[in-house]
From Swiss-Prot:
Disulfide bonds join C132-C138, C366-C405. It is an enzyme of class 3 (hydrolase). The gene is AED3. The keyword Protein transport does not apply. Residues 1-23 form the signal peptide. Keywords: Apoplast, Aspartyl protease, Disulfide bond, Glycoprotein, Hydrolase, Nucleotide-binding, Protease, Secreted, Signal. GO terms for molecular function: aspartic-type endopeptidase activity; nucleotide binding. This is Aspartyl protease AED3. Residues 104-444 form the Peptidase A1 domain. Glycans are attached at N140, N148, N184, N211, N297, N353. Gene3D superfamilies: Acid Proteases. Belongs to the peptidase A1 family.
């Protein structure tokens, strides 16, 4: 049985993907520094991560541009989810050589005795999977889950009802012996893996969740797999949210820290207790073709006091085409359908009113930082909710501090040109609350540090 009540929530410490030079306490300790039941989360590139590169630039814009270089893979992946009926091989991922995806990771423990795993949080995925011992093509055998070391590990048979919930099944049509539930999937736009459906004990802070189901990756290829797997927070039956409904009531929220500090941290809360009381909600829309994605009804965008003219076809939710707007934790820069972005950009440039603009990486509207004080705020209008983005979520500065850029972009033409994505850069220092049973999402300002 789980060790906490239905209303238990936990705090997950989130950090930024930067190099740490000093520390006032042991930030890599498994337990929370204050002795609470918080479950620690660390940045995938930080010193506490086993995947941290030797050298990481501390420049905010360099870090953002580096992470945003993976957005094209992410958008291709999201596009594949909503473009028509999903194919058997059109979901999760694995890679072997290079990390291209995942900005925040959570420390979770699996097995008996518990093995510490660092798993990427993904709101647009409904699966939980990780590389297991003996995986061919996985990035590092030392970071894999050792199934032989867990006394509570077990496989799931093809004959079980749960096996039918996995996409890309490869179970034999007939077999004299019960076969292990196996499947093939893809993720991130350029990666694929084969896995077995298994069960083991999942430990989240003090909560012990027996018989938790997840994909145990046996072989992988491509460039998009988080080295120790993924923790899907979508609405599908195999996600963390769905498998822990009796414990956390299908409610979770997160507050992502700003990219402007070495030490800022944020939190992820699971369950009803501790969620903000003063928060405004907008309905969640459900796409039956891909129910895991968290769609919202974006009705318009204002730049300053001007609501920009946009053809409703680029904002209207359409389950058949996948059109609409989603909130996603894995994309770095908010992307709009090109006509929507151009309308926002042109009005923004008009109000900034400088003689010329330059381009920097993914950003095409950069100007002298001396004119930053005239930059207008951008408001996203949703049903029953107007989200006025803080300036730190709208502008980003060059390494030298001489340029300021509008930190949004259009969707490239060969991606799904009708899917708008509200990304993590624009979600920072906001509490984003997902209330799945009541089909709503709440947003409120909150300092996430």
């Amino acid at each position: 049985m789980a060790s906490s009540s239905l209303h238990f929530f936990f705090f997950l410490t989130l950090l930024l993907p930067f190099t740490f030079t000093t520390a006032t306490r042991d930030t890599c300790a498994t337990a929370a520094p204050d002795g609470s039941d918080d479950l620690s989360i660390i940045p995938i590139n930080a010193k506490c991560s086993p995947f941290a590169p030797t050298h990481v630039s501390a420049s905010v814009i360099d870090t953002v541009l580096h992470m945003a270089s993976s957005d094209s893979h992410r958008l291709t992946y999201l596009s594949s989810l909503v473009a028509g009926k999903p194919k058997p091989t059109s979901v999760p991922v694995a890679s072997g050589n290079q990390l291209h995806i995942g900005n925040y990771v959570v420390r979770a423990k699996l097995g008996t005795p518990p093995q510490l795993m660092f798993m990427v949080l993904d709101t647009s995925n409904d699966a939980v999977w990780l590389p297991c011992s003996g995986c061919s093509g996985c990035s590092n055998a030392s970071t894999s889950f050792n199934t032989n070391s867990s006394s509570t590990y077990s496989t799931v048979s093809c004959s079980t009802a749960q096996c039918t919930q996995a996409r890309g099944l490869t179970c034999p049509s007939s077999s004299p012996q019960p076969s292990v539930c196996s499947f093939n999937q893809s993720y991130g736009g350029d990666s694929s893996f084969s896995a077995s459906l298994v069960q083991d004990t999942l430990t989240l802070a003090p909560d012990v969740i027996p018989n938790f189901s997840f994909g145990c990756i046996n072989s992988a290829s491509g460039n998009s797999l988080p080295p120790q797997g993924l923790m899907g927070l979508g609405r599908g039956p195999m996600s963390l949210v769905s498998q822990t409904t009796s414990l956390y009531s299908g409610v979770f929220s997160y507050c992502l820290p700003s990219f402007r500090s070495f030490y800022f941290s944020g939190s992820l809360k699971l369950g009803l207790l501790g969620q903000p009381k003063s928060i405004r909600y907008t309905p969640l829309l459900r796409n039956p073709r891909r129910p895991s994605l968290y769609y919202v009804n974006l009705t318009g965008v204002s730049v300053g006091s001007v609501q920009v003219p946009v053809d409703p076809v680029y904002l209207t939710f359409d389950a058949n085409s996948g059109a609409g707007t989603i909130i996603d934790s894995g994309t770095v820069i908010t992307r709009f359908a090109q006509p929507v972005y151009e309308a926002i950009r042109d009005e923004f440039r008009k109000q900034v009113n400088v003689s010329s603009f330059s381009t920097l990486g993914a950003f095409d509207t950069c100007f002298s930082a001396d004119n930053e004080n005239v930059a207008p705020k951008i408001t996203l209008h949703m049903t029953s909710l107007d989200l006025k983005l803080p300036m730190e979520n709208t502008l980003i500065h060059s390494s030298a501090g001489t340029l300021t850029c509008l930190s949004m972009a259009g969707i490239r033409q060969n991606a799904n040109a009708v899917l708008n994505v509200i990304a993590n850069l624009q979600q920072q220092n906001l509490r984003i609350l997902f209330d799945v049973p009541n089909s709503r999402i709440g947003i409120a300002p909150e300092p996430c540090n």
